[in-house]
A protein has these predicted regions:
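Extreme N-terminal, non-catalytic leader segments
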Residues: 5, 9-50
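P-loop/Walker-type NTP enzyme "switch/lid" segment
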Residues: 50-56, 71-150
Length: 200
């Protein structure tokens, strides 16, 4: 099991997650998924941080995981921001880009960083849950550096159009939660719904 953040440094938590995902890449070729899948993709791993509870930190954890795996661990990643209309991660990327464009200091820092990691920033695509899979397929067909992992930042409700369909195509779904009774109950309901309706 993954270590909790309070049990050790946050980097250790992401290192454990990285080791788990890396090991699962090899297993994926030998084991068929238990999720009902319509995907015809090859090696990319689709990952979503999702619950039916809003404001639990899905966008934050998605951005942290994508940035750590891309910038520190060297994986090629991409993010499909399906959390319309706020598009928190896409908005953050636009603000970062504007800041770099307007400041020679930050431009120099960015150039130095990308030179060190020998790659550009990972792509962030603004989408919605209904069109997320099509946008991911289009992005994968166009990208020169094919992502190893594609993260999907999902809306905070299962009632949004396309959420269940998109989640049904994930290789891994992580459900962030806090130590709160209502959050835990909501997350358990989400897991039961997923098990009963989308697992074969």
């Amino acid at each position: 099991p993954l270590k909790r953040i309070r049990d050790g440094p946050i980097c250790q938590c992401f290192t454990d997650a990285d080791m788990y995902i890396t090991a699962s890449v090899q297993e994926q070729e030998n084991n068929s998924s238990t999720i009902k899948s319509n995907r015809t993709m090859s090696n990319e791993i689709f990952v979503a941080f999702a619950t039916q509870k809003g404001g639990i930190g899905k966008s934050t954890v998605t951005a942290l995981a994508a940035s750590y795996l891309h910038n520190v661990q060297g994986h090629n990643v991409a993010v499909i921001d399906c959390d319309a209309p706020q598009h928190s991660i896409h908005g953050l990327r636009e603000r970062e880009t504007k800041l770099i464009d307007e400041s020679l200091y930050f431009k120099a820092l960015a150039c130095d960083h990308f030179r060190k990691i020998k790659k550009n920033a990972y792509p962030v695509i603004a989408s919605d849950a209904l069109n997320a899979l099509d946008d991911a397929e289009r992005m994968l067909a166009e990208e020169d550096a094919k992502p190893d992992i594609v993260f999907f930042d999902m809306p905070g409700t299962l009632k949004s159009n396309g959420v269940v369909k998109t989640l049904s195509q994930m290789d891994y779904i992580f459900a962030p939660m806090s130590a709160d009774r209502f959050v835990v109950e909501s997350t358990l309901q989400f897991a039961v719904m997923f098990r009963d309706n989308l697992m074969t």
